[in-house]
């Protein structure tokens, strides 16, 4: 979501908006995004909004995205919290993953294991 604005030209940026959360029908994958940023021309950036699921936190939790970072044009940008991708499958149906290759759940969903930082696109 979009951040709110300060009360004057040198005011602080408003808080970030809430993240988006959605459950994909018929799938074992649930995605929750982080909150939006607070943006203003001068002054401090706003704090992050609540992540998907309504939980205000710096990083993602189970089924919840983290809050977004504050941002403005003068002082350094604060990093936003992480969104999360949660993959669920029955505990009596073990999955294995070897060499970075995708595994496939019984319902056909692909389970991909990856490590790193920055921006990822999973499709």
Where are the regions a protein language model picked out?
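Low-complexity, glycine/proline-biased repetitive segments and flexible coils/loops
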Residues: 1-123
């Amino acid at each position: 979501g979009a951040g709110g604005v300060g009360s004057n030209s040198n005011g602080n940026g408003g808080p970030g908006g809430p993240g988006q959360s959605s459950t994909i029908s018929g799938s074992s994958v649930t995605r929750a995004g982080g909150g939006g940023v607070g943006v203003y021309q001068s002054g401090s950036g706003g704090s992050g909004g609540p992540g998907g699921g309504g939980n205000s936190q710096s990083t993602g939790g189970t089924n919840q995205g983290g809050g977004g970072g504050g941002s403005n044009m003068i002082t350094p940008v604060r990093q936003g919290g992480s969104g999360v991708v949660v993959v669920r499958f029955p505990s009596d149906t073990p999955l294995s993953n070897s060499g970075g290759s995708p595994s496939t759940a019984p319902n056909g969903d692909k389970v991909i294991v990856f490590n790193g930082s920055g921006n990822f696109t999973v499709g």
